[in-house]
């Protein structure tokens, strides 16, 4: 059935974690009969168990549905259920590029949170029509008037015609459907006969059909049998199938301007399909791509090693399979004297890293060790060239470069007013700077801060939640690079460097971090027959030390009384043996010691 553009509405739903975005999606699917009552389950669009458990959306899930409005016309709704976390910011911005409007869901009890602010800015940058929806109005703690004021004052969105809903019970949800029809504009296009331009907003890998590309048709149309080109990557493919999401994939004869759907071609390598790329016909195609495309690069790196060397092929296989549906993360082989063979992996951010590691453990039943996360530093070499550094082991001698710069974040932290002092203190402790404050309401304040990315990697979120009694929320965006006094810190056991423990730290934090790591290792490495010094060093300078005291074998047990000189002789022999053992002995480091240091059990003091 042909759809005029006036009858199409493309929209997304944006919200802070736990404000009810996915529940509202479920209600919309139910009310438009896109999913039958028998098939409907909580969080229908969140396909991964991990998404359901954490209550977050990790992967975009588009869905098309038909709705007969009160005006008697039938409309085609295309809902793009996007991730909300900052790690997936580029994916969110491209998904928004496929929409004309957004439902902004705000919890009527919690109010505007950090992620609400960040995602609203994305929507405003994409020039979307924003429809505010106050959710959970049935809760006893709901304060509709106060939250409406916050939305007007902080987000500059007029609340002339607010929508009050309870996505859980369905109250007010039919009004949301009418608002989508009346307040979100239809797609604007050059027409069905114009050269094809389609925006790629996601892709998935199917082991039988290869890469399935999710697109929004901006201009023109496409059908099976046509040859298309991806303008940024230059890849060409013949289309075998076009289809829509309802909510599962359903083949259709053609996709036309304004529609959202999928393309199945002959591409087998997911890395060839880039989010934000423009698809056009190879023959008589568009000359100008859609604006906004750029390559995404990992910002957080860590090493992933199997607990047992026998599982190395399984870890490689697991990473390869995950990479097929998530080409944003990168990996390549690396080896460590301490941990053996493993992989150096790059991620879009901390949440992205946690998700990949958790999926390896859960979906492939693997035991892995992950080294401390690190960021990408920029070295200015003596000849003026800039070199990226994502692995402490590749850090050159300080005489080889002039300066080192680290990534900085612009962070918004929303916290209860009574916790503002503690929150400012932890920002300062992490080498951050508070640039300004903004009063949200009588009880909450928003801090505008600048923070080094390296400082929030280990336990910043935990500390933030702790000092604010679980009430603070935070969102951030990259703010470029800044010169800094970053040094490489090594850990030595019995005088030998252990490469797996090498880490990059700011010089002012090196001693504290060194003491923590030495203490953690001294507490977890069992005693040997000789004393083991555990040292932290920057270059040749030792900055921290702990000793593991030896256990003593009772060499006098076999002597029965007798001359004291005989006992002294045996003890002297033991002492010489221990000295020799200290010189040539090998320190056995148990897995628990690596895990204690590498899995972040060392917290900032």
Which functions belong to the PLM regions below?
Residues 1-605:
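Structural and coupling elements of P-loop NTPases
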